[in-house]
Design a protein with these regions (language model features):
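A short acidic, Gly/Pro-enriched loop at the edge of an enzyme's catalytic core
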Residues: 108-119
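A short SAM/SAH-binding and catalytic strip from SAM-dependent methyltransferases
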Residues: 118-131
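Core SAM-dependent methyltransferase catalytic element
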Residues: 184, 197-217
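Conserved class I S-adenosyl-L-methionine
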Residues: 148-178
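N-terminal, positively charged/glycine-rich alpha-helical extensions of SAM-dependent methyltransferases
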Residues: 1-20
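Conserved alpha-helix/loop element of class I SAM-dependent methyltransferases that forms part
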Residues: 30-49
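A short glycine-rich, Lys/Arg-flanked "PGG" loop and its adjoining helix->strand segment in the class I
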Residues: 133-145
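Class I SAM-dependent methyltransferase SAM/SAH-binding core
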Residues: 50-109
Length: 217
């Protein structure tokens, strides 16, 4: 693949746009679904939870989230206008029933009041955070006391084999992510690394190592 093509893939993964963006949203939902479910399960969702997700993509997983417990409210934040629209369309029933709420944001400031959420999660977004420490402090601010944050990401050892990650991506190992978290008031209360077979963005089957870090306020 040419450099320009790789750069285009990286840009679409960071911020899907246009027809290619819809395809990318569908593909990300399929290839990341195990990671997303792992993140959701580690939240240990309980009845009445208010849950925030950063960077939900097309949000094809929200139905699974609502199966975890009764009386949940889900709030999704997205930087991509296209994914925001797709997520609202795919989850239109939850939106009309006032169970799911989608908003756009700038990736830095979380447009919600302090201590609103009991659970927060984010999957495959950490590579794109412009100000990681600042964003973690924002998440800390909107979490309730004893609230849980799950950060799920593919390990640097896997990601650096993908040619497009040289653009736009800041890759993380578990150790690097832990060092980042140590700069914030969060406590790490759990971590798990799993390996799964996935089809790469270029089509072949590869082993992917991914990690979920479970943090508590």
């Amino acid at each position: 693949m040419k450099q320009e093509e790789l750069q285009a893939i990286a840009s679409q993964l960071k911020h899907p746009t246009g027809e290619k963006g819809i395809e990318m949203g569908n593909m990300m939902n399929e290839t990341n679904i195990n990671m997303t479910h792992h993140s959701i399960r580690n939240l240990q969702i309980q009845s009445g939870d208010k849950i925030l997700e950063l960077g939900h993509g097309n949000a094809g997983h929200v139905e699974f989230l609502f199966e975890q417990a009764q009386n949940l409210k889900y709030y999704g934040l997205e930087m991509s206008e296209l994914m925001y629209q797709e997520a609202r369309q795919i989850n239109r029933n939850f939106v009309s029933q006032k169970q799911a709420f989608f908003s756009l944001y700038d990736g830095n400031k979380i447009p919600f009041e302090d201590a609103l959420f009991s659970k927060v999660f984010t999957v495959n977004t950490i590579y794109f955070w412009e100000n990681p420490e600042q964003l973690l402090l924002e998440i800390y601010r909107v979490l309730q006391s004893k609230g849980i944050l799950c950060i799920t990401f593919a390990e640097e050892s896997f990601m650096k084999q993908l040619p497009f990650t040289q653009f736009e991506f800041d890759l993380y190992s578990t150790e690097k992510a832990e060092k980042l978290i140590e700069k914030t008031p969060f406590k790490i209360i759990g971590k798990e690394t799993l390996t799964e077979k996935v089809k790469s963005k270029t089509g072949e089957l590869v082993d992917r190592n991914f990690t979920t870090l479970v943090l508590e306020k």
